[in-house]
């Protein structure tokens, strides 16, 4: 016996693979099982029963030319009915071994090969059919993709997010009709995900409305774990799509195995139809065995001929049906564009218009899935939709960022407003809009922000920062923010990415923009019109502009502070500055300036000027600052200024002068005539001495001389009795004057990094100077008298 279980490895496949088997493959599979049973049954009979039984022929030698067994054929019987002889039996004088020998010899020589090997051929051909059908499920290059696809498909089908997404869309589509019914509640079927309700369910709702209303819909429940699983599914689908759409090995393999089955079908059909008649019940056998048996002619009976002929015709019938399925498969493969798959019907049904069409092997597998159940493709499409993914991300964000967690991040910013700062999130949590106490919202590196209508709940919002965070603002929210928002900071790689709605916030007081102009637009430096910003007082622009944007003049009547940071790009045209009549503060930082622009001298209301980090070498134009009668703060730091001209004495109103990080070696004596000066910073230069005239600065409160080459200080310096901060660190001082006792207001003194051997005892007379305000080496401090140290350490 041949156990059928031995053939399981050819027929058994993973149950999950059934989703990739269309009806013709299923039919072909059953046909192969039937053909295999025919072959196994025939082989079993062939092995367990006698194959052939032979008897010697007693014909005369005169009739030796006639075929043996002729008299046993049906036509012989009909012709010789009248001439039958009555026989009482013949003795052959053969023993059992001779009969067995003759049977085997005639089986091998006289019986046609088709009759001998028919059942084996059936088994072999059927196994080849099975291998061809399941080869792409076993071949490593295709099976890995199929297994991965089926794994993802099953998870997508069973995911609670699929049901929720389809149900939400269904609810939106039926929202209108349902809203008009006061007594009928629509129930969404979770199992199918289609959002349709059967007639029986509708009747139940009509009969028991109270019961339906009290039960919350299951589709609205999605816990955090399920949300994370759905998020992982989206990533898997994306990577799988990119991987599978690259080639068409699955499509090609399926075509090849189908073509091979068709060719084999024709070959089997032809030779079976030709040789099936070779299966006969009586077989004439002529062998030269007269010396052994005494006979050379035998008449043999093929015992299974009758059964084999019936099995052969049955097998041919199954093969014909099998071949028809293969031909239909070829028609289906070449008649339809199987390398392209459109989700058009799914988009129309679900309303998810962003579901993309797919191609190559991905499309082919989806076509096969549709032959099994189109619901699989519909539910799988949910994970191809970016809208669906964004909804899921939003839901996960809301789970992760609860209102209590967001409140823990609230803190006061530099402007004193209660600020919520969020950085590098996949989206903006809806729970943000539940914090009505938020006054400032800072969003950094958050992709594709879309402000919902819930923005109107932030009634105290006055400041908004968008740092590399593109944001869409609906019209209703624009109206809400138009008169409410006071400060907005926007930062992008390029300024053209700045949302246009920013320039329509008419209540805005401060606008901070950061981003580069494209190289072809940098020279023109065109900025959106600022005419709508009627309340704008502060404008900050960090870019690579070649000139001051012309739109700055749109706010010339009320702009009070302008800051231009050019990141080293040279600012060539500044004529637009002349129109800023009420400008109080001007910053031109890293603008590549080599001279002080003349346009600045036209700003009569200017109070503060910052020219930090430019290429200024000479400041002879400083004389023209006398036209800026209100100028009180001048910052010329981080340049290459080698000297200060004597005209500095003309700046009578100047209160703060910053000249640090330059190349100064001396200071003019005329600097002492700036009697209103309160702060002077000349640190990080190359000063070797100070003019005694600095003692005339009776209003001076802060003097920074650190990181120079000073070897001594003029005694006149200690006439500045209002001096509170004196920074002398990292110079070449060898001694410190005892006249420091005259500085009664001194509260901070830096002497670290000099060549001092001792500190004067008079430091104890500086009533405002404490140990915390004295920056000096520990050894020098310990060298002070104990009573001086005790006095300085008193609270």
UniProtKB/Swiss-Prot annotation:
Topology within the bilayer: Multi-pass membrane protein
Recorded superkingdom: Eukaryota
Glycosylation sites: 63, 301
Chain positions of LRR repeats: 535-556, 558-578, 582-603, 605-626, 630-651, 653-674, 676-697, 699-720, 722-743, 745-766
Gene Ontology biological process terms, A to Z: aspartate transmembrane transport; cell volume homeostasis; cellular response to osmotic stress; cyclic-GMP-AMP transmembrane import across plasma membrane; intracellular signal transduction; monoatomic anion transmembrane transport
One cellular component term from this protein's GO annotations in UniProt: monoatomic ion channel complex
Disulfide pattern: 54-300
Record's subcellular location: Cell membrane; Endoplasmic reticulum membrane; Lysosome membrane
Molecular function in Gene Ontology: volume-sensitive anion channel activity
Cytoplasmic domain ranges by topology: 1-22, 138-264, 334-795
Reactions catalysed according to its record: chloride(in) = chloride(out); iodide(out) = iodide(in); taurine(out) = taurine(in); 2',3'-cGAMP(out) = 2',3'-cGAMP(in)
Key words, A-Z: Cell membrane, Disulfide bond, Endoplasmic reticulum, Glycoprotein, Ion channel, Ion transport, Leucine-rich repeat, Lysosome, Membrane, Repeat, Transmembrane, Transmembrane helix, Transport
Record carries keyword Mitochondrion: no
Transmembrane segments: 23-43, 117-137, 265-285, 313-333
Extracellular side: 44-116, 286-312
Function: Non-essential component of the volume-regulated anion channel (VRAC, also named VSOAC channel), an anion channel required to maintain a constant cell volume in response to extracellular or intracellular osmotic changes. The VRAC channel conducts iodide better than chloride and can also conduct organic osmolytes like taurine. Mediates efflux of amino acids, such as aspartate, in response to osmotic stress. The VRAC channel also mediates transport of immunoreactive cyclic dinucleotide GMP-AMP (2'-3'-cGAMP), an immune messenger produced in response to DNA virus in the cytosol.
The record's note on its domains: The volume-regulated anion channel (VRAC) channel forms a trimer of dimers, with symmetry mismatch between the pore-forming domain and the cytosolic LRR repeats, a topology similar to gap junction proteins.
Similarity-based family: Belongs to the LRRC8 family.
Annotated PANTHER family: LEUCINE-RICH REPEAT-CONTAINING PROTEIN, PTHR48051
Subunit: Heterohexamer; oligomerizes with other LRRC8 proteins (LRRC8A, LRRC8C, LRRC8D and/or LRRC8B) to form a heterohexamer. Detected in a channel complex that contains LRRC8A, LRRC8C and LRRC8E. In vivo, the subunit composition may depend primarily on expression levels, and heterooligomeric channels containing various proportions of the different LRRC8 proteins may coexist.
Protein name (Swiss-Prot/TrEMBL): Volume-regulated anion channel subunit LRRC8E
Species whose genome carries this gene: Rattus norvegicus (Rat)
Gene for this chain: Lrrc8e
């Amino acid at each position: 016996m041949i156990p059928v279980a031995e053939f399981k490895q050819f027929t058994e496949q993973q149950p999950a693979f059934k989703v990739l088997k269309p009806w013709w493959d299923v039919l072909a599979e059953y046909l192969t099982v039937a053909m295999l049973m025919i072959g196994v049954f025939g082989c079993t009979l062939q092995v367990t029963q006698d194959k052939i039984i032979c008897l010697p022929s007693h014909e005369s030698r005169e009739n030796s030319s006639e075929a043996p067994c002729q008299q046993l054929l049906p036509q012989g019987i009909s012709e010789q009915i009248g001439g039958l002889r009555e026989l009482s039996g013949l003795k052959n004088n053969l023993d059992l071994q001779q009969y067995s020998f003759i049977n085997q010899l005639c089986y091998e020589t006289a019986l046609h090969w088709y009759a001998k090997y028919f059942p084996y051929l059936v088994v072999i051909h059927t196994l080849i059919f099975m291998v061809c059908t399941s080869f792409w499920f076993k071949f490593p290059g295709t099976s890995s993709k199929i297994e991965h696809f089926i794994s993802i498909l099953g998870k997508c089908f069973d995911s609670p997010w699929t049901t929720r997404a389809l149900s939400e869309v269904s609810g939106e589509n039926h929202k209108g009709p349902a809203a008009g019914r006061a007594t009928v509640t629509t129930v969404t079927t979770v199992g199918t995900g289609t959002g349709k309700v059967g007639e029986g369910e509708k009747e139940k709702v009509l009969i028991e409305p109270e019961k339906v209303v009290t039960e919350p819909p299951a589709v609205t429940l999605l816990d955090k774990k399920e949300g994370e699983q759905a998020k992982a599914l989206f990533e898997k689908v994306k990577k799988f799509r990119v991987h599978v759409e690259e080639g068409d090995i699955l499509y090609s393999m399926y075509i090849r195995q189908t073509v091979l089955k068709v060719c084999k079908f024709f070959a089997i059909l032809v030779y079976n139809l030709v040789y099936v008649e070779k299966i006969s019940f009586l077989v004439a056998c002529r062998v030269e065995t007269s010396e052994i048996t005494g006979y050379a002619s035998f008449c043999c009976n093929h015992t299974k001929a009758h059964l084999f002929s019936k099995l052969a015709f049955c097998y041919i019938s199954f093969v014909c049906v099998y071949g028809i399925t293969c031909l239909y498969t070829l028609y289906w493969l070449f008649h339809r564009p199987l390398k392209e798959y459109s989700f058009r019907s799914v988009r129309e049904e679900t309303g998810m218009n962003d579901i993309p069409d797919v191609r190559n092997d991905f499309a082919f597998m989806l076509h096969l899935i549709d032959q099994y159940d189109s619901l699989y493709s519909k539910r799988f499409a949910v994970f191809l939709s970016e809208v669906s993914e964004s909804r899921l991300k939003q839901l996960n964000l809301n789970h992760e960022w609860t209102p209590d967690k967001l409140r823990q991040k609230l803190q006061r910013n530099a402007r004193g407003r209660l600020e919520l700062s969020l950085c590098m999130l996949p989206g903006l949590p809806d729970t943000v809009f539940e914090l009505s106490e938020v006054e400032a919202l800072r969003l950094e590196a958050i992709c594709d922000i879309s402000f919902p209508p819930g923005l109107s709940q932030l009634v105290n919002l006055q400041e908004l920062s968008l740092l590399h965070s593109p944001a869409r603002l609906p019209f209703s929210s624009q109206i809400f923010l138009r008169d409410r928002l006071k400060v907005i900071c926007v930062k992008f790689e390029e300024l053209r990415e700045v949302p246009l709605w920013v320039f329509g916030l008419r209540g805005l007081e401060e606008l901070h923009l950061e981003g580069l102009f494209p190289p072809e637009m940098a020279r023109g430096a065109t900025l959106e019109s600022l005419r709508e910003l009627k309340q704008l007082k502060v404008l900050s622009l960090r870019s690579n502009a070649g000139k001051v944007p012309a739109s700055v003049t749109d706010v010339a009547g009320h702009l009070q502070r302008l800051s231009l940071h050019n990141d080293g790009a040279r600012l060539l045209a500044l004529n637009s500055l002349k129109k800023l009549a009420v400008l109080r503060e001007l910053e031109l930082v890293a603008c590549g300036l080599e001279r002080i622009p003349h346009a600045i001298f036209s700003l009569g209301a200017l109070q503060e000027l910052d020219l930090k980090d430019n290429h200024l070498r000479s400041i002879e134009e400083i004389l023209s600052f006398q036209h800026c009668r209100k100028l009180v703060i001048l910052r010329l730091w981080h340049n290459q200024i080698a000297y200060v001209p004597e005209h500095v004495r003309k700046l009578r109103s100047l209160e703060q002068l910053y000249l640090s990080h330059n190349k100064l070696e001396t200071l003019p004596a005329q600097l002492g005539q700036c009697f209103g000066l309160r702060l002077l910073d000349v640190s990080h230069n190359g000063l070797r001495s100070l003019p005694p005239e600095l003692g005339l600065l009776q209003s001076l409160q802060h003097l920074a001389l650190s990181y120079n080459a000073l070897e001594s200080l003029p005694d006149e310096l200690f006439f500045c009795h209002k001096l509170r901060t004196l920074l002398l660190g990292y110079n070449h001082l060898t001694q410190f004057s005892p006249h420091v006792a005259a500085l009664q207001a001194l509260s901070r003194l830096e002497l670290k990094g000099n060549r001092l051997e001792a500190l004067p005892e008079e430091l104890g007379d500086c009533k405002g100077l404490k140990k915390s305000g004295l920056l000096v080496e520990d050894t020098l401090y310990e060298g002070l008298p104990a009573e001086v140290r005790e006095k300085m350490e008193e609270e």
